[in-house]
């Protein structure tokens, strides 16, 4: 389970365990060496390739049958069934020390009047900083003042609740004290090259001819599929309904598709296939690319304005009483926008605010709690779609618990940018079982979930995984 410990304050999660619990097993057909002919079923075209058996031995994507019958070769014999298992690279969760050490943080804070942060926020605060040649006066803007006030309100909640969960993690051995010899052995992590820019492909796909809206917008990965076009991948929801992992090869890059998962790879302007999916969802998790100064400077990924986020068709995607969860940065401007504008425009009532607290493997905050620059926590705003019609609820006889406020989700963050921890297990007491679940702006897939985004396959890249065992 991804939940290592659960207390009244919240949960201590093991993100890596959750990924590996998915059980990424690839089932391949392996012919004995005496075979006469090479058996492959491949579809090739200019920019997309889908294989049944790849030359590297990794099973690929258009077989979703759960049948255990072994196919016959040309001699009438059977191919051997070969199983290969993959796990997520554990070094991507090796966060052995804080991103900013407390000593460095303390040195940076020596010239600041820390009492102003803890003893109340005033409308105008100025700090005299003595430079090498002259004094300069730093005045906090309103956004910074609001952030200080918000931090003051939740600081003790974050500190006390996190320490309780961290202590449990240290007792159980999930978290461990950092010894000097462990830190010396750390090596730089080599990440896969972004040779296949998914977002750029989605941008190009916008110029493909659109399908008739009345057409069925779903592509099931089944054995009978004989041809696939670019339009099939980019303009349809793709499903792996089998109990096994599949692989697709896109622009020469391989991506693992977990069992019982589905996805739509598209730009925000091409969400119509998701609306034509003939499904509404009981849980919708949103991780918008919020606009901020650092994103503008880095050009690492595109961002959306509040107006663009507001235009996401949540009312058409949400089932009655749908639980909506939105990840949000610590900017008070974004928090107010969700609570005062975004959710009301979608007829969603705010019911709780939770906090994701990021720690190291030894239980330290990844940033000093009182750092004026970056905090070791992020927020989640939870809301319920308000009833507008007399439509019957799915599983209306199933009772779910009311959602408590200010719960903590404490975990070691993945070193990959914006790879959020899973919410399935922490939400299970507050949602109906066997519901329909959707993640928007997703960068990975989950069994039982539909995922959408222009980088929806990003963290499914096979290079993020390691083959750990094989057998027949």
Curated annotation (Swiss-Prot):
Transmembrane segments: none annotated. Its EC number is 2.1.1.72, 2.1.1.-. It catalyses: a 2'-O-methyladenosine in U2 snRNA + S-adenosyl-L-methionine = an N(6)-methyl-2'-O-methyladenosine in U2 snRNA + S-adenosyl-L-homocysteine + H(+); a 2'-deoxyadenosine in DNA + S-adenosyl-L-methionine = an N(6)-methyl-2'-deoxyadenosine in DNA + S-adenosyl-L-homocysteine + H(+). Changing residue 42 to F: Found in a renal cell carcinoma sample; somatic mutation. Keywords: Chromatin regulator, Cytoplasm, Methyltransferase, Mitochondrion, Nucleus, S-adenosyl-L-methionine, Transferase. It comes from the Eukaryota. It is found in: Nucleus; Cytoplasm, Cytosol; Mitochondrion matrix. GO terms for cellular component: cytosol; mitochondrial matrix; nucleus; oxidoreductase complex; RNA N6-methyladenosine methyltransferase complex. GO terms for biological process: methylation; negative regulation of gene expression, epigenetic; regulation of mitochondrial DNA replication; regulation of mitochondrial transcription; regulation of RNA splicing; snRNA (adenine-N6)-methylation. It is an enzyme of class 2 (transferase). SUPFAM superfamilies: S-adenosyl-L-methionine-dependent methyltransferases (SSF53335). One of its GO terms (molecular function) is site-specific DNA-methyltransferase (adenine-specific) activity. PANTHER family: N(6)-ADENINE-SPECIFIC METHYLTRANSFERASE METTL4, N6-ADENOSINE-METHYLTRANSFERASE. Belongs to the MT-A70-like family. N(6)-adenine-specific methyltransferase that can methylate both RNAs and DNA. Acts as a N(6)-adenine-specific RNA methyltransferase by catalyzing formation of N6,2'-O-dimethyladenosine (m6A(m)) on internal positions of U2 small nuclear RNA (snRNA): methylates the 6th position of adenine residues with a pre-deposited 2'-O-methylation. Internal m6A(m) methylation of snRNAs regulates RNA splicing. Also able to act as a N(6)-adenine-specific DNA methyltransferase by mediating methylation of DNA on the 6th position of adenine (N(6)-methyladenosine). This is N(6)-adenine-specific methyltransferase METTL4. The gene is METTL4.
């Amino acid at each position: 389970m991804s939940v290592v410990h659960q207390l009244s304050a919240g949960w201590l999660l093991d993100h890596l365990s959750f990924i590996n619990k998915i059980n990424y097993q690839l089932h391949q057909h392996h012919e004995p060496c005496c075979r006469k002919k090479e058996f492959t079923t491949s579809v090739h075209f200019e920019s997309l390739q889908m294989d049944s058996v790849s030359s590297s031995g990794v099973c690929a994507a258009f077989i979703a049958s759960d049948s255990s019958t072994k196919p016959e070769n040309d001699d009438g014999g059977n191919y051997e069934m070969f199983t290969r298992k993959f796990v997520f690279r554990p070094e991507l969760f090796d966060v052995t020390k804080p991103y900013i050490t407390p000593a460095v943080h303390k040195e940076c804070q020596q010239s600041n009047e820390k009492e102003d942060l803890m003893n109340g926020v005033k409308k105008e605060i100025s700090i005299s900083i003595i430079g090498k040649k002259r004094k300069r006066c730093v005045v906090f803007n309103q956004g910074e003042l609001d952030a200080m006030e918000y931090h003051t309100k939740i600081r003790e909640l974050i500190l006390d609740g996190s320490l309780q969960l961290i202590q449990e993690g240290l007792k159980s051995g999930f978290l461990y004290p950092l010894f000097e010899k462990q830190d010396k052995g750390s090596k730089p992590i080599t990440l896969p090259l972004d040779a296949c820019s998914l977002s750029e492909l989605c941008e190009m796909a916008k110029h493909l001819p659109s399908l008739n809206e009345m057409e069925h917008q779903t592509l099931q990965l089944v054995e009978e599929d004989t041809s696939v076009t670019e339009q099939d991948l980019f303009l349809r929801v793709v499903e792996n309904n089998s109990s096994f992992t599949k692989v697709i090869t896109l622009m020469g890059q391989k991506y693992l598709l977990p069992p019982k998962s589905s996805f739509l790879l598209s730009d925000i302007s091409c969400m119509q296939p998701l609306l034509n999916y003939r499904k509404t969802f009981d849980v919708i998790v949103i991780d918008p690319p919020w606009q901020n100064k650092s994103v503008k400077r880095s050009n690492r990924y595109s961002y959306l304005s509040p107006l663009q986020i507001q235009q996401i068709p949540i009312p058409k995607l949400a089932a009655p009483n749908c639980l909506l969860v939105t990840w949000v940065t610590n900017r008070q401007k974004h928090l107010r926008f969700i609570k005062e504008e975004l959710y009301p425009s979608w007829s969603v009532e705010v019911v709780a605010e939770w906090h994701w607290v990021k720690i190291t493997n030894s239980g330290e905050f990844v940033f000093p709690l009182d750092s004026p620059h970056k905090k070791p926590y992020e927020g989640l705003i939870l809301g319920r779609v308000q009833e507008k019609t007399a439509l019957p609820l799915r599983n209306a006889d199933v009772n779910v618990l009311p959602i408590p406020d200010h719960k903590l989700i404490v975990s070691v963050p993945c070193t990959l940018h914006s790879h959020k921890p899973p919410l399935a297990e922490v939400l299970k007491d507050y949602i109906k079982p066997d519901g329909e679940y959707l993640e928007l702006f997703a960068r990975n897939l989950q069994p039982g979930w539909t995922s959408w985004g222009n980088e929806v396959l990003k963290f499914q890249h096979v290079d993020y995984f390691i083959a750990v065992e094989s057998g027949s």
